[in-house]
Swiss-Prot record:
Protein name stated in the entry: ATP synthase subunit a
Keyword Iron listed: no
Family membership noted in the UniProt record: Belongs to the ATPase A chain family.
PROSITE patterns named among the record's database cross-references: ATPASE_A (PS00449)
Domain of life (superkingdom): Bacteria
Membrane topology recorded in Swiss-Prot or TrEMBL: Multi-pass membrane protein
The UniProt record lists the keyword Cell membrane: yes
Summary of the function given for this chain in its UniProt record: Key component of the proton channel; it plays a direct role in the translocation of protons across the membrane.
GO molecular function: proton-transporting ATP synthase activity, rotational mechanism
Amino acid sequence: MATGAEQTGGGFPVDPLHQFVVQPLIPLNIGGLDASFTNASLWMVVTVVAIGLFMTLGMRSGAMVPGRMQSVVESFYTFIANMVRDNAGHDAMRFFPFIFSLFMFIFFANMIGMFPYAFTVTSHIVVTFALAIVVFLGVTLTGFVLHGPRFLKVFVPSGVPMALLPLVVAIEIISYFSRPISHSVRLFANMLAGHIMLKVFAGFVLTFMTMGVVGWAGMILPLFMIVALTALEFLVAALQAYVFTILTCMYLHDALHPGH
């Protein structure tokens, strides 16, 4: 989210990329490895704490007739539980705690990143790729543990003519191992692009403000665009958490039911 007017060398009042700079807050070097506690680390901790507070405050009463806060928490639970059942099957509910945690982390990280001076951790490919590779390795390991070598049937779609089978298998293998890339880039690129657009239009507003009366009239359009884009970004933040999670459910379905 736009965090102020950082002057760039080219004269544009706002640097759209400044908001993504990872800065060490507590420098730490272990055996030549930079393990500093950064602003990204801080906002990941804030995200986890916010989720913990949200769940604790929402469910502390445990009333049979839920209040507003408890209803919100239960709606998250129901929504994600239905997502798992519909896309991965009822037997996938054993993995519900992981999928629920994954959705909540991405959702809260995206939403927190929309506020001024916050850091959007999901706008960094290293974070989204770490999440995607955990999903990929977990799904693959689950497939082999449950099915052994039969899990390899995931690369052999049913009903494919023998003449096309080698080509189709090759395509399926490439597609499978590219999952972490597409899974992570989708989230990273959407969050990055949206925040850059917000910062660019904020720069236009600041530029027009320095032009006197004419500039104040000219800033109406970019100011309107900021409001519209902010609303759109909140929608995208929620949607990307949903997309990342539903893809995880679909990948899990492949592990539980290979060859289907």
